[in-house]
């Protein structure tokens, strides 16, 4: 059948398999152009491929990659056969479509090979047209975009202009309420500054401007609750009458009352006026301005805080007023007068404390010498007063101090270079500390100033500060220390405010122990709750304000403390040597902070501000915290100490925590009351000579930030500052926690010097009260506050630092070494506190060496300050560790009080002799 096939006939030989392409070539019709050959090497195939793809898709109605690739492959040959391509494509495309396709493709290839670029001229023309069209379209789009952009710009400009108008209308309002209030007040305040002190008016103005809302609210809470919402300075001031004094009277009062202080302090003030006024004015102006702009938000925050807290503050003022009323009219009047006079006096006394530190110190020391007894009133009322009526406190300060302040200022004015510096440092540290920790400082100031005993403490502080200074540059140091203290006093004075308040209030608390404890617990919870806001606000605004006020030169001390201050705080801890005296004093006020659980808040705020400012200041709160920023910046402090965060948390969240820590603090305050029993003796001792130390001891935590920042008081102050740093952390959670570490510090400091012993003992009384507080409320206080301060606070190292600073020989190294050892030694100190009470000085020496090694790594400068403070506090340290055990504390309280009083009298006499001589 197919024999031929099997016979070997090939398909080529078989006709049946003849080349069909020949037939197809004969049969198919081809376009004429296909006759021409194309050299694909001259053709840019990549340009033609898109056209082929498009064309095949049109013919087939769908995109067939196989056909397209088949065509591409055929064209890749150098000389493709156009007819064969058409025959091959006929199967895919119809014969007709294939013919049309090849008829269109080949001319493109021919034109492409003729073109230099290998691109068909048609494509070039198309491209040109496309380009033209694109250009036209682009131009249209560009014109449209321009129009849209113009419209957008116009809209934006309109919006911006409207916003600017709104902002201007708002900012003037804000600035009117905030910066204008400082400016408005600053005009009289500037006059008053010129009169009383370049600083105090502006501190007032700043406190008024930064704290116009907070202060007004503080005033309102300070005044009656009704005036709290009123926010009207006149109403609130009228209600407080010290607020009224605040604007007109505080300055006039300080002017007449502080004239002698001002005369002496005016010399310094004029020095400071030249420098501080330029600073306080330039800084206060720039800061007032910057505060009005930059702090308008913080002020808003303060306002909102003061508003949001004003309820709390209102309750706390109510509570505080009731405690004040409970405490007696002393509390009631001292709070308004003291607090308000303090806010002015603080402001002024920050200025006047720095400027007329002697007047403020005399008033504070006068307030102090009585405060041993009045401290009850002033301690709780002043604290309350401080918080409630910062401005009220100043009038009283001025009223009380005015008579005593004038003589002591003179006494202190002769030492004014040193004592004025110290008084300014201590007073400034107290009042600035108060300003920074308004509540604490207000109380401290109130206590110092509200109780006329303050003069003795002041002399003691002067003697101690002078002893600490040892004749450090009196005028130069006073100016430098004023400057530094303006910065550091915001920290240290808040601490000193706390410690003085704590010291005065410790005696006050010891006197007011039960009633005051309840009241202070009540108030301190409200303080912890409402004052925590207030502290925030007052610390934020007060710190910012009072720090701002006080630091009007360092106006932003609040800010500085908060944002810029964080480094300054550490700087203040370690670098500012002059500040330490303030910090010593500042520590004394912080004890008030400690003694009052709210003051601990203040302390915690001031410690927060201080140690956190030290740490916080690194963070800048922003505006914080001192403390919206101040609360957040305090978180730095708090952040630095994890317990300080607790305090800070205690501040806003822990108003409950604070109330619990405050309760703990109150139980510490109970312990601190026991210790206030001891602390009263301490505060009596320290109130006189150790009162600065007490301020250290109470304030060690607050002071830890402050003192650690200043090396001069560094030993006494730095140890307590470092204590404050660690204690201030612990103070934040619980001041007494810090005290527990502080006893260690105190023991270490015990050997260095009587003053350091005093301050160490004051620190110990601080730490002692914290420890009993930690021991009595140990579960809440010591674990949370002492342990978390010491353990949680790696920043708490300052507490150990405070301990470490005690080694006066190498305060920085020892304090630094001790800083590391302090945490460990906090625990050890807690264990050894009883032994330490008896073996204080020996153990303190050993612990100093150990803590010095540990603290050496921490902060040499802060440690130096802590060592100075510890060395000074150590004499008191022995009594204070006893106080630390509260059971022993109560027994030892009488002995300690006598001992402290004797020491205070000695230091007072020394201070009087050295200032006068």
Curated annotation (Swiss-Prot):
Residues 699-713 have a biased composition (Pro residues). Transmembrane segments: none annotated. Pfam families: PWI. GO terms for molecular function: DNA binding; RNA binding. InterPro entries: PWI_dom, PWI_dom_sf, Ser/Arg_repetitive_matrix. Residues 300-702 are annotated as: Necessary for speckles and matrix localization. Residues 27-126 form the PWI domain. Disulfide bonds: none annotated. Residues 1-151 are annotated as: Necessary for DNA and RNA-binding. There is a cross-link at residue 231 (Glycyl lysine isopeptide (Lys-Gly) (interchain with G-Cter in SUMO1)). The modification Phosphoserine is found at residues 227, 234, 240, 260, 389, 391, 393, 402, 414, 420, 429, 431, 436, 450, 452, 463, 465, 478, 524, 526, 528, 530, 532, 563, 565, 574, 576, 597, 611, 619, 621, 630, 640, 642, 650, 652, 708-709, 718, 720, 726, 728, 751, 753, 761, 765, 767, 769, 782, 786, 788, 790, 794, 804, 808, 810, 815, 887, 914. GO terms for biological process: mRNA processing; regulation of mRNA splicing, via spliceosome; RNA splicing. Keywords: Acetylation, Citrullination, DNA-binding, Isopeptide bond, mRNA processing, mRNA splicing, Phosphoprotein, RNA-binding, Spliceosome, Ubl conjugation. Residues 171-207, 276-329, 336-351, 557-574, 581-606, 635-650, 663-677, 822-847 have a biased composition (Basic residues). Phosphorylated on multiple serine and threonine residues by DYRK3 during the G2-to-M transition, after the nuclear-envelope breakdown. Phosphorylation by DYRK3 promotes disassembly of nuclear speckles. There is a cross-link at residues 127, 231, 249, 447, 459, 472, 882 (Glycyl lysine isopeptide (Lys-Gly) (interchain with G-Cter in SUMO2)). The modification N6-acetyllysine is found at residue 140. Residues 1-156 are annotated as: Necessary for mRNA 3'-end cleavage and cytoplasmic accumulation. SMART domains: PWI. The modification Phosphothreonine is found at residues 220, 241, 406, 416, 569, 586, 588, 595, 628, 731, 791, 806, 885. Residues 428-438 have a biased composition (Polar residues). Belongs to the splicing factor SR family. Identified in the spliceosome C complex. Found in a pre-mRNA splicing complex with SFRS4, SFRS5, SNRP70, SNRPA1, SRRM1 and SRRM2. Component of the minor spliceosome, which splices U12-type introns. Found in a pre-mRNA exonic splicing enhancer (ESE) complex with SNRP70, SNRPA1, SRRM1 and TRA2B/SFRS10. Found in a mRNA splicing-dependent exon junction complex (EJC) with DEK, PRPF8, NCBP1, RBM8A, RNPS1, SRRM1 and ALYREF/THOC4. Interacts with DDX39B, CPSF1, RBM8A, RNPS1, and ALYREF/THOC4. Seems to be a compound of RNA export complexes that are released from speckles in a ATP-dependent manner. Part of pre- and post-splicing multiprotein mRNP complexes. As a component of the minor spliceosome, involved in the splicing of U12-type introns in pre-mRNAs. Involved in numerous pre-mRNA processing events. Promotes constitutive and exonic splicing enhancer (ESE)-dependent splicing activation by bridging together sequence-specific (SR family proteins, SFRS4, SFRS5 and TRA2B/SFRS10) and basal snRNP (SNRP70 and SNRPA1) factors of the spliceosome. Stimulates mRNA 3'-end cleavage independently of the formation of an exon junction complex. This is Serine/arginine repetitive matrix protein 1. It comes from Pongo abelii (Sumatran orangutan).
């Amino acid at each position: 059948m197919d024999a031929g096939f099997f016979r070997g006939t090939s398909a080529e030989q078989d006709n049946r398999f003849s080349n069909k392409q020949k037939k197809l070539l004969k049969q198919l019709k081809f376009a004429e152009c296909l006759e021409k050959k194309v050299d694909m090497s001259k053709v840019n195939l990549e340009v033609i491929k898109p056209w082929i793809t498009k064309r095949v898709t049109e013919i087939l109605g769908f995109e067939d990659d196989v056909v397209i690739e088949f065509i591409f492959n055929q064209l890749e040959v150098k000389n493709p056969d156009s007819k064969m391509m058409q025959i091959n494509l006929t199967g895919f495309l119809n014969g007709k479509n294939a013919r049309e396709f090849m008829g269109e493709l080949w001319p493109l290839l021919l034109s492409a090979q003729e073109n230099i670029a290998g691109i068909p001229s048609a494509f070039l023309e198309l491209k040109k047209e496309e380009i033209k069209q694109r250009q036209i379209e682009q131009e249209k789009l560009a014109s449209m975009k321009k129009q849209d952009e113009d419209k957008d710009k116009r809209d934006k400009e309109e919006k911006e202009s409207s916003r600017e108008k709104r902002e201007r209308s708002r900012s003037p309002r804000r600035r009117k309420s905030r910066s204008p209030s400082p400016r408005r007040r600053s005009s009289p305040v500037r006059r008053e500054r010129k009169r009383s002190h370049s600083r105090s008016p502006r501190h007032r103005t700043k406190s008024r401007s930064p704290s116009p809302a907070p202060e007004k609210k503080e005033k309102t809470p300070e005044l009656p609750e009704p005036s709290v919402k009123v926010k009207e300075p006149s109403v609130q001031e009228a209600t407080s009458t010290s607020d009224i004094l605040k604007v007109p009277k505080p300055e006039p009062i300080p002017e007449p009352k502080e004239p002698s202080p001002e005369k002496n302090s005016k010399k310094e003030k004029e020095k400071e006026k030249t420098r501080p006024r330029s600073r306080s004015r330039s800084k206060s102006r720039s800061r007032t301005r910057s505060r009005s702009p930059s702090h308008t938000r913080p002020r808003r925050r303060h306002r909102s805080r003061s508003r949001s807290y004003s309820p709390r503050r209102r309750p706390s003022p109510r509570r505080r007023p009731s405690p004040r009323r409970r405490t007696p009219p002393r509390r009631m009047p001292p709070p308004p007068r003291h607090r308000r006079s303090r806010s002015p006096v603080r402001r002024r006394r920050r200025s006047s404390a720095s400027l007329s530190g002697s007047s403020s110190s005399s008033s504070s020391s006068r307030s102090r010498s009585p405060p041993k007894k009045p401290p009850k009133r002033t301690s709780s009322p002043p604290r309350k007063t401080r918080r409630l009526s910062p401005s009220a406190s100043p009038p009283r300060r001025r009223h009380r101090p005015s008579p005593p302040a004038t003589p002591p200022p003179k006494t202190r004015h002769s030492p004014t270079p040193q004592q004025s510096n110290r008084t300014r440092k201590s007073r400034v540290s107290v009042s600035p500390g108060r300003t920074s920790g308004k509540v604490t400082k207000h109380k401290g100031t109130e206590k110092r100033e509200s109780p006329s005993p303050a003069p003795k403490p002041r002399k003691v502080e002067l003697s101690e500060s002078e002893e600490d200074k040892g004749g450090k540059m009196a005028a130069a140091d006073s100016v430098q220390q004023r400057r530094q203290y303006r910065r550091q006093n915001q920290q240290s004075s808040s601490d000193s405010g706390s410690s003085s308040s704590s010291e005065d209030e410790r005696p006050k608390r010891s006197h007011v122990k039960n009633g005051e404890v309840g009241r202070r617990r009540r108030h301190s919870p409200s303080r912890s709750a409402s004052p925590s806001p207030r502290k925030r606000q007052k610390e934020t605004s007060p710190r910012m304000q009072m720090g701002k006020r006080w630091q009007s030169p360092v106006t932003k001390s609040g800010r500085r403390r908060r944002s810029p201050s964080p480094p300054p705080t550490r700087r203040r801890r370690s670098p500012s040597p002059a500040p330490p005296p303030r910090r010593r004093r500042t520590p004394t006020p912080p004890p008030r902070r400690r003694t009052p659980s709210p003051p601990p808040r203040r302390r915690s705020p001031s410690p927060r501000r201080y140690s956190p400012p030290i740490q916080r200041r690194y963070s800048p709160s922003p505006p914080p915290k001192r403390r919206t920023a101040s609360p957040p910046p305090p978180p730095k402090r708090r952040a630095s100490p994890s317990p300080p965060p607790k305090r800070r948390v205690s501040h806003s969240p822990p108003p409950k925590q604070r109330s619990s820590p405050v309760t703990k603090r109150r139980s510490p305050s109970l312990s601190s009351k026991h210790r206030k029993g001891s602390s009263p003796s301490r505060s009596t001792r320290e109130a006189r000579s150790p009162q600065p130390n007490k301020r250290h001891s109470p304030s060690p935590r607050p002071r830890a930030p402050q003192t650690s920042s200043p090396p001069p008081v560094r030993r006494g102050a730095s140890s307590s500052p470092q204590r404050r740093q660690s204690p201030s952390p612990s103070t934040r959670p619980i001041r007494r926690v810090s005290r527990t570490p502080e006893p260690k510090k105190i023991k270490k400091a015990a050997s260095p010097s009587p003053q350091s012993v005093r301050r160490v003992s004051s620190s110990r009384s601080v730490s002692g009260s914290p420890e009993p507080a930690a021991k009595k409320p140990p579960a809440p206080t010591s674990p949370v506050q002492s342990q978390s301060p010491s353990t949680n606070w790696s920043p708490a190292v300052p507490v150990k630092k405070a301990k470490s600073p005690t080694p006066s020989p190498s305060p920085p190294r020892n304090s630094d070494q001790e800083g590391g050892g302090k945490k460990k030694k906090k625990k050890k100190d807690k264990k050894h506190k009883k032994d330490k009470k008896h073996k204080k000085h020996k153990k303190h020496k050993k612990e100093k060496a150990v803590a010095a090694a540990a603290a050496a790594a921490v902060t040499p400068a802060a440690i130096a300050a802590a060592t100075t403070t510890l060395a000074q506090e150590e004499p008191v340290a022995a009594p204070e560790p006893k106080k630390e055990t509260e059971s022993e504390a109560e027994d030892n309280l009488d002995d300690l009080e006598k001992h402290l009083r004797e020491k205070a009298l000695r230091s007072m006499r020394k201070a009087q002799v050295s200032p006068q001589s």
